[in-house]
Regions:
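Structural and coupling elements of P-loop NTPases
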Residues: 1-531
């Protein structure tokens, strides 16, 4: 089993929207041999869409709205690659993915450097001590200087950058990269639409083909920069990389396949295999005999013909075997894992065995929820996955009374994914769902999917609240009646029947907290610690 563990690499790709995250994902699949022809997020109708953006809404909008698992073998490695949504409204899904990986590839736009969402996701990685590999993308467009980008990584993220390779030229004159550890030049040629692997010439910086294709002043400039890096730059230290204090930096252009193979190979060589995890007072090593794993994502309706739901489980220890019996931590019951699948975007195939680091899909278990532990050892219970505090609220009206059954069934299944909550309001006599989410785009996703997947048309109506706080767990309706929150506030319960109080503004929430001595209002549910 140790051999299987050591060849696993489980990682996510993160970035600010439009930095090229999903494009890099697709090109890694191309170079990894998992696809023969790479699609593009911004592809025209007669071209292929990306493998990871399989949902109809993603294809229409050209953005990722849900994380995707892609598994493939490459040069002896078993790769579990997770593409994540970039937009902040989907950050809760991305955060859950980051609990399930052992390393991260951070994509930066060479023209923009570190952007807001990148910084937020980086902080999550830092808290978890996850190693970070950096790909500076779009070097074939007008961009910041390479040294400026390294300085930005160090000053903004407090992360020591080690450039594994160095760009030769920039913008329209970007020719390739110099690989510092191997001391080799890689010069690329463009392919039509970037759909195929880019032809590349590899050799010494003094070779004739380099002098023919790269202007003398460009060669002189990078020679000077490389000397400066050797004198002043950080050393390549594997321990510092694995500790998350140093980030290897790769330059390239995902759209044109420049440098993609180099980061794929570099990452696989230097990234860690599956790591151990804390669980209820003990530490679970991947090599432990007892099987264990946790559910970090639920996807409803992946197969519209069967209206099924898939629970994504990260295997942490032991060997998974189809039909095995395990304990379900939240219910204490024993369950049989009969329908298990290997995942590749929307595609799936039955898997009979899997090992630590693998992500597999389990079908047919309505009781499974996000954060649940499954294990052959009843005492194993991994830390719960935190929920984000909702900041957007909306009523969701069913537009067709004749389709109420489809509307209700669809909403119930989409709620199980955990991206949105359905609130119950105290004293409400109208059966209109009140949705709560991290951002308003989540509501658009629900509305679109209800119509496209369940044939249920709905209408969104903005709700008048901006802030939600949790009351103590046992807070009763009688106790609610004794309070006088600001005008526009509303008492209610979240999807797990925890009492909440909704406010029209941050000011109203702060005012009420300051004038309610002894009342403990929380930004997280009662069973979750505030970070």
């Amino acid at each position: 089993m140790q051999k299987e563990i050591s060849r696993r690499r489980t990682f996510a790709i993160i970035s600010h929207p439009d930095a090229g995250k999903t494009t890099l994902t697709e090109k890694m699949l191309l170079y990894g041999g998992a696809v023969q022809l790479a699609g593009s997020v911004r592809s025209r109708k007669n071209q292929r869409a990306t493998t990871s953006d399989w949902m109809e809404l993603e294809r229409k909008r050209g953005i990722s709205v849900s994380s995707t698992v892609l598994q493939f073998d490459y040069q002896g490695y078993q790769i579990n690659l997770l593409d994540t949504p970039g937009h902040k409204d989907f950050s809760e899904d991305t955060y859950r993915v980051l609990t399930a990986v052992d390393a991260v590839v951070m994509v930066l736009d060479a023209a923009k450097g570190i952007e807001a969402q990148t910084q937020k996701l980086f902080e999550v990685c830092r808290q978890r001590g996850v190693p970070i590999f950096t790909f500076i993308n779009k070097c074939d467009r007008p961009s910041k200087g390479a040294i400026e980008l390294l300085d930005e990584i160090e000053s903004v993220l407090q992360l020591k950058p080690f450039p594994v390779n160095w760009p030769i030229g920039d913008g329209a004159d970007f020719k390739g990269v110099f690989e510092r550890l191997a001391k080799q030049v890689h010069l690329f040629e463009r392919t039509t639409g970037g759909a195929y692997m880019a032809p590349v010439e590899v050799g010494d910086i003094l070779d004739d083909f380099v002098k023919e294709r790269v202007p003398g002043e460009t060669l002189a400039k990078i020679t000077e920069e490389l000397e400066m890096l050797d004198i002043a730059g950080a050393e390549f230290d594997s321990d510092e990389i694995l500790a998350g204090r140093t980030t290897p930096v790769f330059f390239g252009s995902a759209m044109n396949n420049f440098g993609v193979e180099l980061i794929l190979k570099g990452f696989l060589h230097h990234a860690p295999p599956p790591q151990g995890r804390p669980s209820a007072g003990k530490f679970i090593e991947p090599s432990d005999e007892q099987f264990s794993g946790f559910i970090f994502k639920i996807q409803a309706n992946m197969d519209p013909k069967h209206r099924d739901r898939i629970a994504y489980i990260r295997i942490c220890s032991g060997k998974f075997e189809r039909d095995m019996m395990v304990y379900h931590s939240r219910t204490g019951k024993k369950v049989r894992l009969a329908s298990s699948h290997r995942l590749f975007g929307k595609e799936r195939e039955t898997v009979n065995e899997a090992f630590p680091g693998d992500i597999i899909g389990l079908v047919g278990h309505a009781d499974f929820g996000i954060g649940d532990t499954l294990s052959t050892d009843k005492t194993t219970n991994f830390h719960e996955i935190p929920r984000f505090t909702p900041e957007s609220f909306s009523y969701l009206h069913n537009s067709d009374t004749g389709k109420f059954k489809q509307f209700r069934q669809g909403l119930e299944q989409l709620l199980q994914e955990g991206a949105i909550q359905c609130l119950s309001l105290k004293g409400s006599t109208v059966a209109v769902p009140v949705l709560a989410a991290v951002g308003p785009l989540q509501f658009d996703v629900v509305q679109f999917r209800l119509e496209s997947e369940y044939n249920a048309v709905s209408r969104l109506e903005p709700a008048p609240w901006q802030v939600m706080r949790w009351l103590p767990a046992e807070f009763s309706e009688e106790e609610m009646d004794k309070l006088s929150p600001p005008t526009g506030s509303r008492f209610g319960w979240d999807s797990e029947r925890n009492p909440v109080l909704l406010f029209a503004s941050d000011w109203a929430a702060s005012y009420f907290e300051q004038n309610s001595a002894g009342l403990n209002l929380s930004r997280v549910p009662p069973n979750q610690k505030e970070s």
